[in-house]
Amino acid sequence: MNRFLSALTAAARRLLPQVYLTPALRRLLLASAMLAAAITLAGQPAAAQSWDTSHWTASWGAAPAGPPADASPHTFTDQTVRLVVQSSVGGNRVRIRLSNELGSTPLRIGAARIGLRAQGSDVAPGTDRALTFGGRAGVTIPAGAPALSDPVELHLPPLAQVAVSLYLPGAVQAPTLHGQARQTSYVSSTGDHTASASLPVQRTITAWPFLTALEVDGMRGAVVVLGDALTDGARSTSDANRRWTDVLARRLQAERDAGARLGVINRGIAGNRLLADNPANPLAGRSALARFERDVLATSGARQLVLMVGIEDIGNGSAANPVTLDDMVAGYRQLIARARAARIAVIGATLAPFEGAALYSVEKETLRQAVNTWIRSSGEFDAVFDADRVLRDPARPSRLLPAYDSGDHLHPNDRGYQALGEAMPLLDAR
């Protein structure tokens, strides 16, 4: 308070001489300003007078999309959902982010809790914590809005299985979700079972409704990967965390000391495009250009960005609606500029081969090669991740190496994702 009033006095003394005032009136105005400031500060709650100096970093994240064409698997009536995610980095305080971005009505969360998962839907003893929102046990999230929980003390190890439980009173449809979680989560029988160590499971889901981030306090920062199905881990083994970003998270834990370990945040959406939305598939999400602020810049602690998106633009191009190299370069340059403005380093990933896939053509392969040449040689990225070279068949570079092909000639299998995660270049933490 004393420092504030001293500063106010000094400011007033600098300002007031610029206007002709009598000494008495000058003293009166100065005293009035100081009294008003003192009254204002006295009326503020203690919490409002202090700054949160924590350094929050995302440890897990998913990009929301939707709504799904069939909403029935993601409709809840007075039930608890227990969502299972895996941390990348650890900490001793945690918080979560929820989203009702695509909802048309307010979303009521009656209660929320977090803990380490033991197995199945069970929470490990001694780790269950209640989450609050502005000090309250529940929160109503307006249509189109996100919500951030209050921090809670919880020792979260890196690479830990985490259970986030949300009680949804009333009837709720989940228009905001990540549709291809490749992870089993759980839906309870009727009622608030957020505090139950073992959930009374009615059914399971393989999506992450509403939950978009798990954050920890005190880590150095995060690598955000903006991508499509290859980032989302399409056709990898479910419930095994075999996405290439999971491999990268394990590498960072093994190869770096604690001060240089970065969170790894997967913002991939299967079917996602660089330049335009896919109106035929709502679960493919908004284009990378459209979702960049939400999924990259708003990620707590974002320090590095991997751009691994564009093959869906090429594969879905047509004679009536062609995509050109200039279009792709303009899109990449826009994302690079927006990342650099936020002091985020950008790693460009080349596009993987897809000969034999349903969307393949010779013309599209020519464009893919041109895009990859630009990514490798333009010098516009801080580093290049040559995913094409990792995954391609040396004997036929337009197709995936058979040992890495999941069978659809577009998406890798677990071995292919492992190879990607091991080949990803590591930049210095910054």
Q: For each predicted feature, which ranges?
A:
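Conserved SGNH/GDSL esterase-like catalytic core that processes O-acyl groups on lipids
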Residues: 60, 83, 106, 115, ...
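Bacterial N-terminal signal peptides that target proteins for export
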Residues: 3-32
